[in-house]
């Protein structure tokens, strides 16, 4: 099965796993998905992630994070830039997500980073998604 938007599929799988209270989820691996998972781990939204190989295919295993009252660290995820409607912004147009309580994940000429990092480094790029 070919996907037209693998990042949206990745975010949807995370959203569905959180709603079903799963501890982990497996998705087909890619470099971009691994970078998104790295940022989510650095920002404290997931517990961990690792890339493994099963049946000859690369798998990205994401371990979700829940609080003491079984509340997920991720409240919601939304895809911003889509294959049919790319959203590019300059360094001066980067806005805070949910009043600073969330993050935006961007691809820039310097790699995948949060909107906060891009603002600090003075680079713009494509907004992939927002997480809060």
From Swiss-Prot:
Keyword Ribonucleoprotein in annotation: yes
Signal peptide positions (record): none
Superkingdom as given in the UniProt entry: Bacteria
Annotated GO CC locations: ribonucleoprotein complex; ribosome
Keyword annotations of the record: Ribonucleoprotein, Ribosomal protein, RNA-binding, rRNA-binding
GO biological process: translation
Pfam families tied to this protein: Ribosomal_S8
Gene Ontology molecular function: any one: rRNA binding
InterPro entries referenced in this protein's UniProt entry, alphabetically: Ribosomal_uS8 (IPR000630), Ribosomal_uS8_sf (IPR035987)
Keyword Ribonucleoprotein in annotation: yes
Subunit and partners: Part of the 30S ribosomal subunit. Contacts proteins S5 and S12.
Family per record: Belongs to the universal ribosomal protein uS8 family.
Task of the protein: One of the primary rRNA binding proteins, it binds directly to 16S rRNA central domain where it helps coordinate assembly of the platform of the 30S subunit.
Name under which the protein is recorded: Small ribosomal subunit protein uS8
Organism field: Acidobacterium capsulatum (strain ATCC 51196 / DSM 11244 / BCRC 80197 / JCM 7670 / NBRC 15755 / NCIMB 13165 / 161)
